[in-house]
């Protein structure tokens, strides 16, 4: 699992490097392509070491201590011990859209982030199920590739945004022979596709595995199922408006549901299928599922 994670993370970095070099070549030839190569190396370095901070900053997430969130911290610490993990840091996102995600480069540098809305609508058992799900992502080392993919996809979408403006304003420049405008149009069209490919590197099956892990760590598969239903329903009526859709795969449920651009980044299996699997897990654990 560790080797697979490193290979997939390396592949993502190679894709970004190739994309930036291609853009540089389109706009300025080999010299600009080399400059973009150097920029890509720097970006890859920053992404590996600081992508968790980048993602947390997109949501104004604030790291809290045990004094500020005693019940949440107690749940995280207890379940982390049960999972054989170091206690991750805890962050709270100031939004009423209920959701949660885990980030970081490894279990020793992990953060579990939850929204204010999640703390408001879930009971303790349901919250334990959600935290167990996120801790499983940490234990399975999904967090590095997920966080790196989010940072890279976000950067690529920003490139597409800039390229659209270059294409618009460049078309009014009489000194432009049309080459840069054409290049900008190509970037504007192809960059979102590249972002989707990066998102596709995050397997939807990881959510099923995290659901199972969350159910077993918390010992309450019915509570996780109930939490998923509550979050899904809330997101349908109150999708997240802030943040970056490139991070959708990191959340326990896609928080941008209903926004057209978010569908490009949908990496979650249907919630109904996840709940059905939790029913089977409950039976395996000796419970009679009533959800």
From Swiss-Prot:
Family membership noted in the UniProt record: Belongs to the peptidase M48B family.
GO BP terms, alphabetized: proteolysis
Lineage: Archaea, Methanobacteriati, Methanobacteriota, Thermococci, Thermococcales
Cofactor note: Binds 1 zinc ion per subunit.
Active site: 134
Pfam families: Peptidase_M48 (PF01435)
Superkingdom, natural source: Archaea
Organism of this sequence: Thermococcus gammatolerans (strain DSM 15229 / JCM 11827 / EJ3)
Keywords: Cell membrane, Hydrolase, Membrane, Metal-binding, Metalloprotease, Protease, Transmembrane, Transmembrane helix, Zinc
TM spans (from-to): 1-21, 23-43, 143-163, 182-202
Protein name (database record): Protease HtpX homolog
């Amino acid at each position: 699992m560790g080797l697979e994670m490193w290979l997939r993370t390396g592949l993502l970095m190679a894709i970004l490097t190739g994309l930036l070099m291609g853009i540089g070549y389109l706009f300025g030839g080999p010299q600009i392509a080399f400059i973009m190569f150097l920029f890509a190396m720097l970006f890859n370095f920053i992404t590996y070491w600081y992508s968790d901070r980048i993602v947390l900053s997109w949501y104004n997430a604030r790291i809290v201590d045990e004094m500020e969130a005693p019940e949440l911290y107690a749940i995280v610490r207890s379940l982390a011990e049960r999972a054989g993990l170091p206690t991750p840091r805890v962050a709270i996102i100031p939004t009423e859209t209920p959701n949660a995600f885990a980030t970081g480069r490894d279990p020793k540098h992990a953060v579990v982030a939850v929204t204010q809305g999640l703390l408001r609508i879930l009971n303790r058992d349901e919250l334990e199920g959600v935290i167990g799900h996120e801790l499983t992502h940490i234990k399975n080392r999904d967090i590095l590739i997920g966080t790196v993919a989010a940072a890279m996809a976000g950067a690529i979408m920003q490139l597409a945004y800039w390229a659209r403006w270059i294409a618009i304003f460049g078309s009014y420049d009489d000194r432009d022979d049309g080459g840069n405008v054409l290049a900008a149009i190509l970037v504007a069209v192809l960059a979102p596709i590249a972002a989707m490919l990066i998102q596709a590197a995050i397997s939807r099956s990881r959510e099923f595995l995290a659901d199972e892990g969350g159910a077993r760590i918390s010992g309450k598969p019915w509570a996780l199922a109930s939490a998923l239903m509550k979050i899904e329903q809330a997101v349908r009526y109150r999708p997240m408006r802030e943040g970056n859709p490139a991070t959708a795969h990191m959340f326990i449920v896609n928080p941008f549901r209903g926004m057209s651009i978010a569908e490009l980044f949908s990496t979650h299996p249907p919630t109904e299928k996840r709940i059905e699997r939790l029913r089977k897990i409950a039976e395996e654990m000796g419970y009679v599922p009533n959800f």
